[in-house]
Amino acid sequence: MASSGAARPAASRVLQRCQPFSSSTSCAAPVTTWRTLARPSTAAATAQATTQQLRLLSISMPLQKRRTTRDNNRLRGQSTIHRSGIRRPLSVSEEDIPQPVQDEGVGKMREEDTDPDHGLWGFFYDKQLVPTPKQLSAHGRSWTVQELRGKSWEDLHALWWMCCRERNRIATAIRTRQFIGIKKDNPFDEAEARGRTVNKTMQAIKHVLTERFYAWEDARKLAMEDPEINLSGKGPIYTPSLHFESADTSSYIEEPVADHLETPETSGQEKVGELSPAGAVDPSTILASKTGKPVTDAPRSS
């Protein structure tokens, strides 16, 4: 029969195995039983068993610490209105800062501030915001192609930009009527008729410029074929040829130059330009009178 002394070690091992684990003793070392003693223990097996026991027995959060809510801003919570003030006095006088005075004429245009010769007045008719239908209908006819063909380049350029400004005026008048809310049966008849007249003039200007371009292109082609004209940009543009044809003088017959002009002689008519004394005039050569009788000299007194 076994003694009580031999049974004490075995009982202590059984009690140690059945004892409830605590958080203080369970994390210290792994449990040693007779089965673990019988197995060949290694360092890797011991570390794995310890890790599994820590995971199973730990009931706390993995990172159980206070969460940081600060953003490390020392000026957090300070208000620009409700603040305690600066820490130290600054070099600023205690005088009150002058307050700006509200101008009653803010946003209003005065006559003395307006330039009567400003360029933007050109976009309005007689400096009026909305022209009347009578003012819009007071215009002439459009320019024709025949009239514009004799104009210079400067005149065509000036007329083109005048048409552009007129179209801008018409568009401004139409847009202003729509913005103000002027409603009529057909308020844009006069403006549209004026715009059509301007468009016809601009079409005529384009037609004249197209004709001039075609004429210039034809002249350029002829100049390229002319050996006396140089279009390369180097040297003189026009170089006349040095060969001149000699005039054939054998076909011409020299005739004496008359001292005075003569007219064909007729019966009873003397030569024109020939002067003769009064005594050498033949009375028979003088023209007859209306009676048909020859005129004779009157008897001279002795």
From Swiss-Prot:
InterPro entries: MRP-L47_sf, Ribosomal_uL29_mit. It comes from the Eukaryota. Keywords: Mitochondrion, Ribonucleoprotein, Ribosomal protein, Transit peptide. Residues 1-38 form a transit peptide. Residues 255-302 are annotated as: Disordered. It is found in: Mitochondrion. Pfam families: MRP-L47 (PF06984). GO terms for molecular function: structural constituent of ribosome. Its main location: mitochondrion. GO terms for cellular component: mitochondrial large ribosomal subunit. One of its GO terms (biological process) is mitochondrial translation. Belongs to the universal ribosomal protein uL29 family. Component of the mitochondrial large ribosomal subunit. Mature mitochondrial ribosomes consist of a small (37S) and a large (54S) subunit. The 37S subunit contains at least 33 different proteins and 1 molecule of RNA (15S). The 54S subunit contains at least 45 different proteins and 1 molecule of RNA (21S). This is Large ribosomal subunit protein uL29m. It comes from Pyricularia oryzae (strain 70-15 / ATCC MYA-4617 / FGSC 8958).
